[in-house]
């Protein structure tokens, strides 16, 4: 058992998310964020021998768990990488259309609670923050070279931090004296420059969130995968997404809204809306949030929102099909 496996992970909205997929015994499903396999194992329990489950994850520790599962269950295929490679990965596995795809966005509890990963200001550790520790630039490496303006924009846009400019200026001043290479060093700089405190929230929360999102390209990947899933879903197939903060939830909400209704017609158009093809998606029920009992058992579930869409027989607009090639 690796060190990360000693950290307790509670899958959020477990039954609700898998129920939303309406799993068919012979279906093909994708878990785009395997984590420690909570959603995947429940999907597998509902699949028959002819079913398949493809799981994605960037994190090498999560992939180790996924590969162990795949060795004991031949229905499982494993992809070590971000879900933005959705279509390319499915092509490589010889899979065409799928019956459903589930995404549990953001950071997992094992990643937060393993101090060595550098995601949390609760531990003094190397400032890494990469979900995939085998590739890419760490948070410390980026902070060492980013311009003050880039630091400000990332912290403001991805963390919605009011004091982003002051924090960016302080980072640039501090790194001129010594490297900012640990979580504690960064947290101390932020704390000294956030003038007002939010009740129950550490002053470093927004800055750490912002840098993590940027380093891992989290919002770009969400925006990239949604049209790919829409293109690959069978008619009646389901897309289920759990988001934990407003930035990623807004992307999902706007995407589903856009493709579940017709674009407004100009007044001069010689066609009625009723004569247009059916939109490619329809919203499947209202957005769901965890109940009081789940939040009491797992306070980190508090901000979760589950949105579900279903593929219709409607055609997919050409521009959406073109967008899917950008990440292939």
From Swiss-Prot:
Catalysed transformations (reactions): cytidine(1402) in 16S rRNA + S-adenosyl-L-methionine = N(4)-methylcytidine(1402) in 16S rRNA + S-adenosyl-L-homocysteine + H(+)
HAMAP family: 16SrRNA_methyltr_H (MF_01007)
Described function: Specifically methylates the N4 position of cytidine in position 1402 (C1402) of 16S rRNA.
Record flagged with keyword Protein biosynthesis: no
Gene Ontology annotations of biological process type: rRNA base methylation
Gene Ontology CC terms, in alphabetical order: cytoplasm
Enzyme class label: transferase
Protein localization: Cytoplasm
GO molecular-function terms, A-Z: rRNA (cytosine-N4-)-methyltransferase activity
Protein name per the record: Ribosomal RNA small subunit methyltransferase H
InterPro entries on file: RsmH, SAM-dep_MeTrfase_MraW_recog, SAM-dependent_MTases_sf
Keyword DNA-binding on entry: no
Keywords: Cytoplasm, Methyltransferase, rRNA processing, S-adenosyl-L-methionine, Transferase
Family per record: Belongs to the methyltransferase superfamily. RsmH family.
Any Pfam family hit: Methyltransf_5
Source species, domain of life: Bacteria
Residues the record lists as binding S-adenosyl-L-methionine: 37-39, 57, 83, 104, 111
Its EC number(s): 2.1.1.199
């Amino acid at each position: 058992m690796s060190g990360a496996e000693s950290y307790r992970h509670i899958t959020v909205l477990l039954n609700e998310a898998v129920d939303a997929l309406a799993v068919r015994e012979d279906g093909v499903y994708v878990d785009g964020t395997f984590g420690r396999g909570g959603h995947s194992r429940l999907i597998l329990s509902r699949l028959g021998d002819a079913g398949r489950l493809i799981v994605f994850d960037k994190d090498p520790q999560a992939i180790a768990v996924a590969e162990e599962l795949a060795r004991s269950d031949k229905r499982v295929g494993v992809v070590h990488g971000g879900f933005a490679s959705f279509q390319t990965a499915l092509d490589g596995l010889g899979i065409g259309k799928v019956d459903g795809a589930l995404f549990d966005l953001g950071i997992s509890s094992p990643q937060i609670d393993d101090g060595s990963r550098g995601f949390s200001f609760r531990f003094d550790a190397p400032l890494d923050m990469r979900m995939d520790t085998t590739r890419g630039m760490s948070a410390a490496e980026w902070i060492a070279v980013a311009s003050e303006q880039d630091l400000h924009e990332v912290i403001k846009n991805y963390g919605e931090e009011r004091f982003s400019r002051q924090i960016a200026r302080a980072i640039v001043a501090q790194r001129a004296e010594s490297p900012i290479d640990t979580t504690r060093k960064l947290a101390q700089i932020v704390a000294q420059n956030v003038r007002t405190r939010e009740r129950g929230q550490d002053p470093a929360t927004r800055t750490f969130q912002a840098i993590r999102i940027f380093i891992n390209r989290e919002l770009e990947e969400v925006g990239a995968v949604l049209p790919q899933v829409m293109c690959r879903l069978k008619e009646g197939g389901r897309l289920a997404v759990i988001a934990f903060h407003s930035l990623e939830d807004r992307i999902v909400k706007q995407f589903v809204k856009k493709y579940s209704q017709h674009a407004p017609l100009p007044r001069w158009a010689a066609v009625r809306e009723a004569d247009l093809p059916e939109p490619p998606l329809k919203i499947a029920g209202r957005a769901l949030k965890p109940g009081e009992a789940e939040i009491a058992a797992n306070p980190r579930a508090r901000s979760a929102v589950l949105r579900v869409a279903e593929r219709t027989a409607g055609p997919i607009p050409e521009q959406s099909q073109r967008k899917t090639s950008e990440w292939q």
